[in-house]
From Swiss-Prot:
This is DNA translocase FtsK. Residues 533-746 form the FtsK domain. Residues 15-28 have a biased composition (Acidic residues). CDD domains: TrwB_TraG_TraD_VirD4. Residues 298-307 have a biased composition (Pro residues). The gene is ftsK. One of its GO terms (biological process) is chromosome segregation.
Amino acid sequence: MTRSLGDLARGRGDDADDFDDFDDFEEEISTKPKARATTRRSTRASTEDVYEEDGTDSPPRTSSWGRAGTFMDEHADGIALTLVGIAIVLGAAVWLGVGGPVGTFIADIVHLTIGAGAWVLPVALIAAAVALMLNYTPDPQSRTRVGIGGSIILLCMLGLIHLFAGNPAEWAGRKNAGGAIGAWVGTPLELGFSVYLAVPILFLILFYGALKTTGITIREFGGFVTGFFGFGAGAEDDDEEGDDLYGHVDREIETRASGRALPAAEPRPTRVTPRRTTSSTPRRAAASLDRYPADEPGTPPGPPPSVAPTGSRERKQTEASTSIEPALFPEPERRKPSVSETDEFPAVKAPETPAAEAPAPAKDSARDAVAASRENLRQAMIQRSGMDPQGPPKEEPEDNPGVVVSDGDSTYVLPSADLLIPGAPAKTHSETNDRIIEAITDVFREFNVDAAVTGFSRGPTVTRYEIELGPGVKVSKITNLQSNIAYAVATENVRLLTPIPGKSAVGIEVPNADREMVRLGDVLNAPATVDNLDPMLVGLGKDIEGDFVSYSVQKMPHLLVAGSTGSGKSAFVNSLLVSLLTRATPEEVRLILVDPKMVELTPYEGIPHLITPIITQPKKAAAALQWLVEEMEQRYMDMKQTRVRHIKDFNRKIKSGEIETPLGSKREYRAYPYIICVVDELADLMMTAPKEIEESIVRITQKARAAGIHLVLATQRPSVDVVTGLIKTNVPSRLAFATSSLTDSRVILDQGGAEKLIGMGDALFIPQGAGKPQRIQGAFVTDEEIQAVVEAAKVQAEPDYTDGVTEDKGGDSKKIDADIGDDLDDLLEAVELVVTSQIGSTSMLQRKLRIGFAKAGRLMDLMETRGVVGPSEGSKAREVLVKPEELDTILWMLKGADPADAPKEEQWGDDGYAEPVGEGPGDGSDDSSSSDGTTVVRANPAGGVF
């Protein structure tokens, strides 16, 4: 609807459609030149409007295209669903080859008709169905034009495919080319001309079909190309105001709001803008705003504008302005006015007339209509922007300087890093550095090595001296002098780095005589650490160049820490835990602490981040690791059901409300916190239950990264029986403190270097994906600092322990078959190997498990009796009857446990309701019902609450 602002100001309430017209005007003002989606009523509405305004009795003529459009409008959904069904059948038959006899027959017909076009036909049908579902029905003229242009494009494309395929004469070749249609188009052109002329001719016709489909000319296409590549950017900016259909209304509103007089009316160039009617009510002729004076007290309203009779000429213009299809190249999008910009235009209040000067009844009705119109406008602005233009401005919220994390009803204040003691300023140079430079230079001079010290980087523990070699000098000459350099600088802990990463120089690392202590407070208060909002970022220390080093546990994602007694391993564990307490809330990160020594992690007892009290017994530690495995499996099942790949995406969807409980399910989804399990001494656990501990660690480190579960394994005895090959393979990040031998260094780092460290926090750190270790000085935190941070966390919340974490779930109902005997561990390994590789070979078991032929044959017989593999087929490998996704269930059964206790996932039943996999109706084992009837299902059978 097009109605002038003067009509609104005069309150023209002569019929019931005035306020509907006002709503349309308000919508058009707010959405200015944006193209709107056309409804199925638009074409018929514009035709009916013209018919009513014309006043004639003859109904509008309807063409065959119009009748077809009416039929499509009435049956759009049915046609769309039919197209979707055809597309599914074609896609299954053409793409996947699973269409069955009927689908294959249909696919053959389509291939014979359009050849390679059958591959894209399902996509085209889906696009047409979506267009029908979105109510996109062009006017009859556009249908004719698009139909002709699309047919031309289709014929040309099939002809080109036929020619590019070499003009096959056999139908088998035409099925993969352009089909019968492509041969019908391409073969005559090639016979009449040649392939070198037929291809350009088809491209020209194809270009004409594109112009026909889009409805533009070549000149308009050239203008679009120049504008697209930036040649017409200036002209487009200059004409921005002219493109705005309602720009003059905005200027008049600003003029009236400021109280200035309106300027003289200027002729406005006519511009036909492709717009569609959004209302079926008849449109009135627009009256210029300049014909009405400003609203001032005592000013009588002017006469209403006269509406010229609508003749055939104006009817045609109305049809042209309301029924033109949307523009092919839309105008540049303009941003909507913000709330602050909207508030700059105060609403014009109706003037108050004293009782002595009561206007005539006509004036009263007009002012009532004006007041109603303005009130509607104000309500619309409140609804759109959320602010009242006539109301008082909202107060700005005050900034809260504290670090407060709010989650629902609980508000947790992170302990401040200011509780930690800051360190002394770092030194950059000392007399010792000059003396060592002279000593290294003398060694090079004595052995006639063309090399020189070009610089050094002083760290808190060691200083790295950069050696630049002369032309033709081998690096091996420097490495062969390692013992002589150590003798010259009077220390045995000299480490050579060949070369320094990122530099063309050899590094010689010499310990500092005056070591510096790195405080954890300095690391956590470093700008790079403060700017990083990752709650799992931990402070490691300071590198050899004097920069603070921090790293996220999520990126590790599992860490192996090793070092001899007094090397700084326990200090690092304390730094890690204090870092987590100062950066993460209990809702974000939960902890499982395993302390076989019973004294290292005692200060952290009672913090709200704990899932279970600090574990000191190895048997309970093994049960806790098994609980982590079950928790990991349950999380993966939930992520599978919600179709996410990482716990971050799952929590984001939970908080935004995108994940809803399936119909009929009693499960209540909650956001999962990250879980970090810290084992202070792995050697004690491996001595007690090595098989169970290793199996749980391997499963967690292999799969738990995306589930938000991370392991930090520390040991002071990095031998091969503690840090096994499977554990090393699946723990990518390593932190090595000083070790007692080169063998231990190779176990933890797969290379030497840790035996050269000087202890007391000196470490080599290899994060995931790094090629060479980075030497750092670990951060130190005192017992008083630990106590202060722990108390700040404990006073805010009590620990919410989870039941069943440390319960031994293996000795209750396990009944191992008698024929298995003591071979259960070997049988489990054999089953996992066979099911994973899908090869049932006895010789493979011999090689992989390093067992004899007799035992391998016995294991194969045991697997045959339990349905894992089929019977023997002579020299051929046996058939594997268990799929890889069924491995966990078969292992669970072989251990003698009840299969019903295995982790379950929910799937959709036949009746449309969610049912747990493997449970019958009415089987609800661990459900707990609340007073309001809501049943919360625990996340895993061990009793986890996440």
